[in-house]
């Protein structure tokens, strides 16, 4: 393995391990938050279009659901979701899972497994890719290793 290959391998391995570590920490924090949170059912009562660029018109944006749920039987709380998607465009009346920290229903979020996976999964996948690229860089090519073996007495 050449000196350059060793340096690149170490850089890619280091970045990959850091990304995997971040992924594990995000997963653990999300798992413990979800485990300790209060889970309930909410209803999408409205959707709001937010454009990603205020000066443009057209399709650059997403639909954000407005969700109503009952933290107590006599109190209905309504919140705007921070997660938007075209999926929510015609979703008024749909039921969604909602979760929030005990004592803080005003900080409720939609419990979407795909969004939750994306928070830690994307970072972890990038870490695995960095490690794989580092391993590929560090592997000697078959032609180089054959030449070295033939040239040795």
Curated annotation (Swiss-Prot):
Keywords of the record: Cell inner membrane, Cell membrane, Membrane, Transmembrane, Transmembrane helix
Stretches in topological domain Cytoplasmic: 1-6, 138-153
TM spans (from-to): 7-27, 117-137
Matches recorded under InterPro entries: DUF3592
Topology with respect to the bilayer: Multi-pass membrane protein
GO biological process assignments: bacterial-type flagellum-dependent swarming motility
UniProt keyword Transmembrane helix present: yes
Localization: Cell inner membrane
Periplasmic face of the membrane: 28-116
GO CC annotation, single: plasma membrane
Protein name in the entry: Inner membrane protein YmfA
């Amino acid at each position: 393995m050449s000196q350059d290959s060793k340096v690149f391998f170490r850089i890619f391995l280091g970045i990959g391990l850091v990304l995997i570590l971040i992924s594990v920490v995000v997963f653990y924090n999300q798992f413990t938050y979800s485990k300790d949170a209060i889970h309930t059912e909410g209803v999408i009562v409205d959707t709001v279009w937010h454009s990603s660029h205020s000066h443009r018109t057209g399709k650059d944006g997403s639909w954000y659901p407005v969700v109503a749920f009952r933290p107590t039987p006599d109190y209905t709380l309504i919140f705007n979701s921070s997660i938007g998607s075209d999926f929510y465009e015609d979703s008024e009346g749909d039921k969604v899972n909602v979760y929030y920290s005990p004592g803080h229903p005003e900080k409720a979020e939609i419990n979407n497994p795909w969004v939750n996976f994306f928070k830690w999964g994307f970072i972890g996948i990038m870490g695995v890719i960095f490690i794989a690229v580092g391993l590929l860089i560090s592997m000697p090519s078959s032609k180089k290793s054959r030449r070295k073996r033939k040239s040795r007495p």
